[in-house]
Amino acid sequence: AGYVTPGSYEDPVMEYFAVRNQAGVYDISPLIKYRISGRESEAYLDRLQLRSMAKLKPGRVTYTAWCDQYGRVIDDGTVFRLARNDFRLCCQERMLPWLLDSAIGFDVSVSEETAEIAGLSLQGPVAFAILEQLGLAALATMKPFDIRSFELGNVPMLISRTGFTGDLGYEIWVTP
C-alpha cells in the first residue's frame, strides 16, 4: 500500500492509558477506501454486505461485513453514506477486482480512492475538547456514526463520530 506505520510509539501501556483517560491519535490513511456511486448503488451494496443501505441515511456511517456469494466473510469495515447515491467503503483488505466483478449488471461506478483520502482518528474521552479548541465546536451536536463536512484553516474535511476504541472518538478525512 506504500505506507509504513509503527506498531506503537514508545510504550504501548502508556498509549493504552492515554486513549482511555485522555486521547490518542492514529493515522488511518492506510485503510483502503472505495467510492461507490450511481443510481443502483444502494441495491449493489445490499448484495455485498450485511446491513440494509435503505436504513443508512445520508450523513451516517455503519459498521458491516462483506460476504462472498457463499455467505463467507471477506472483510469488515465501515460504509459512509455521503449522499443518496454516493457511498465510501473503508476496509483493511484490497478488493477492487471483486467489487468490480460484483458491479456487473448494476448501474454503479466503483473506484479506489485510498491515495486521494488521508485520515486521522482521534479517540478518547477528551477528543471533543481537543477539536473544540481547534474551532470545531459544532461537533457537539454530532451523534455516534454521524458524518459532516467542516472547514478548518481553509481545509475542507469530513469528520465522522466513529472509531474502534469503544470511547468517544472522531475520524477526520481530508484530501492531502
Segments from the language model and where they lie:
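Glycine/proline-enriched, intrinsically flexible loops and inter-domain linkers
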Residues: 1-176
